């Protein structure tokens, strides 16, 4: 069915006021969008940042009167409205549209990430079937791609691999399909642990092959291979801990790092690892090396 969409151009300071007011006058959803292609990376802890110029989009039932909505907003906020407009939009099958756009992707020589509803393009390749969970890795982001390609290029047979910040489990599962003996995944998000477990089962990974932990429950260990696709800040602050999780002679790959942050992150690991040249893609980098 169609919907009435109301759009307001607001500042971050106005966001909460107008969100509350729109919900009070009957909006069924309220969404904030960047108005000027302004990226936000690594926000401070316990903050929900907005762009300096933000579009607020609210959906109403199609029979809602936009002039009445605007009149109620003026009444509730006690102020003239910022730049605003209303239009009727047709409903779409958003899930189907998204599924159609998520296609199989190849990483390196052997590895494919294949949506579970899609046929594998190469039956004899290493095919990882994925139903991505909310906000977790699918391989479409450059940092995930950098890590997957790195894993594809390693000799993983017989190794133990640690996926630190496992998200969907895509890196741990890829390592197992590429020959790792066992993998360990850890994440601070319980939903990530569940998504990883579901994706492992979808790929026929036995429970004893993949151990999943919240950080506080992870046992002491030194892995043969550690991959961490998180953020530069945690990678720097956790450098002593992550370095200690890799055995002497073991391998490390880090991503989730902006290009301008690469040297700082590399410096945090240089004492403990013989580092490879930094690999850059689309403004993101991968740092890898071997434990001294």
UniProtKB/Swiss-Prot annotation:
Its main location: cytoplasm. It comes from the Bacteria. It catalyses: L-lysyl-[protein] + 3 S-adenosyl-L-methionine = N(6),N(6),N(6)-trimethyl-L-lysyl-[protein] + 3 S-adenosyl-L-homocysteine + 3 H(+). One of its GO terms (cellular component) is cytosol. InterPro entries: Ribosomal_L11_MeTrfase_PrmA (IPR050078), Ribosomal_PrmA_MeTrfase (IPR004498), SAM-dependent_MTases_sf (IPR029063). It holds the Pfam family PrmA. It is found in: Cytoplasm. GO terms for biological process: methylation. Its EC number is 2.1.1.-. GO terms for molecular function: protein-lysine N-methyltransferase activity. Keywords: Cytoplasm, Methyltransferase, S-adenosyl-L-methionine, Transferase. The keyword Transferase applies. S-adenosyl-L-methionine binds at residues 144, 165, 187, 229. Belongs to the methyltransferase superfamily. PrmA family. Methylates ribosomal protein L11. NCBIfam families: prmA. This is Ribosomal protein L11 methyltransferase. It comes from Pseudomonas putida (strain ATCC 47054 / DSM 6125 / CFBP 8728 / NCIMB 11950 / KT2440). The gene is prmA.
């Amino acid at each position: 069915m169609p919907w009435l969409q109301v759009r307001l151009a607001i500042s971050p300071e106005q966001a909460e006021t107008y969100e509350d007011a729109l919900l009070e006058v009957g909006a069924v959803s309220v969404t904030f969008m960047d108005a000027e292609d302004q990226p936000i990376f690594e926000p401070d802890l316990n903050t929900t940042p907005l762009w300096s110029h933000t579009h607020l989009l609210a959906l109403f039932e199609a029979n809602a009167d936009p002039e009445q909505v605007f009149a109620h907003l003026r009444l509730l906020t006690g102020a003239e409205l910022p730049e605003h407009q209303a239009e009727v939009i047709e409903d779409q099958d958003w899930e189907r549209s998204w599924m159609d756009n998520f296609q199989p992707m190849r990483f390196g020589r052997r590895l494919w990430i294949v949506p579970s509803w899609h046929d594998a393009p190469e039956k004899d390749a290493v095919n990882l079937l994925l139903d991505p969970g909310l906000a977790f890795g699918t391989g479409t982001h450059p940092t995930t791609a950098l890590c997957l390609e790195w894993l594809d290029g390693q000799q993983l047979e017989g190794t133990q691999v640690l996926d630190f910040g496992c998200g969907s489990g895509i890196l741990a599962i890829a390592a197992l399909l590429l020959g790792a003996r066992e993998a360990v995944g850890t994440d601070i998000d319980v939903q990530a642990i569940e998504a990883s477990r579901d994706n492992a089962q979808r790929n026929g990974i036995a429970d004893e092959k993949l151990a999943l932990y919240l950080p506080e429950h992870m046992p002491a260990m030194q892995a043969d291979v550690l991959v961490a696709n998180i953020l530069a800040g945690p990678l720097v602050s956790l450098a002593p801990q992550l370095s200690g999780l890799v055995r002497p002679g073991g391998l490390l790959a880090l991503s989730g790092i902006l290009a301008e942050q690469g040297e700082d992150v590399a410096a945090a690991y240089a004492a403990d690892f013989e580092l490879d040249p930094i690999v850059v893609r689309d403004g993101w980098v991968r740092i890898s090396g071997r434990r001294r």
